[in-house]
């Protein structure tokens, strides 16, 4: 973690820049694609799970869809941020020249197209524990074997055949994207066995 305090590391007209007080964690790009958000999109948040307190979490808006987060944050963003103790009021989207009193810049624990650092497990453990604590006791009973469908996967034209084979083996076929994030966590926590192809659906495991 590069800890930058009382240093100006920018070029430009400081008179026109905004100034942010307090301790700020720079978290990289705010990914709106689900699979990228729960992988490299969370990979700079590990100081939070190490019990370091921050006043704000600063993101760069991704090139596509930044306004959609401001106007209507996706359900999974809200759920995961809440699980990490981050309120939406703490999130800053950097759209203009900005100075910080204290800025923490962690190296990504999961760089894109690379291996994940073990500290990512601490982030996912927080999400898992929050999910379990959010569910009623009767919702934690063991359930079916699940096959996670990839109905929108254009790389396969035999999805119905694959799904039929899993149904014959006693699996319940589900398309997780049809459920709220909390409901997805409930289904996965209930499952005896989960099967599927590599992709966003299995990232939840």
Regions found by a protein language model. Give the residues of each.
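The feature primarily captures lumenal catalytic ectodomains
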Residues: 1-204
């Amino acid at each position: 973690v590069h800890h930058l305090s009382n240093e100006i590391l920018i070029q430009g007209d400081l008179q026109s820049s905004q100034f942010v007080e307090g301790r700020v964690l720079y978290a990289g790009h705010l990914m709106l694609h689900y699979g990228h958000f729960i992988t490299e999109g969370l990979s700079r948040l590990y100081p939070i799970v190490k019990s370091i307190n921050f006043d704000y979490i600063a993101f760069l808006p991704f090139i596509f869809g930044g306004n959609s987060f401001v106007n209507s944050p996706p359900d999974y963003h809200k759920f995961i941020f809440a699980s990490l103790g981050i309120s939406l009021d703490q999130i800053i989207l950097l759209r203009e020249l900005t100075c910080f009193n204290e800025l923490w810049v962690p190296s990504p624990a999961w760089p894109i197209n690379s291996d994940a650092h073990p500290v990512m497990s601490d982030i996912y453990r927080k999400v898992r524990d929050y999910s379990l604590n959010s569910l009623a006791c009767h919702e934690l009973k063991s359930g079916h074997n699940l096959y996670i469908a990839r109905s929108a996967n254009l790389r396969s034209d035999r999805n119905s055949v694959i799904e039929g084979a899993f149904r014959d083996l006693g699996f319940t076929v589900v398309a997780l994207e049809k459920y709220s994030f909390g409901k997805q966590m409930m289904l996965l926590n209930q499952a005896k066995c989960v099967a599927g192809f590599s992709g966003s659906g299995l990232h939840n495991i």
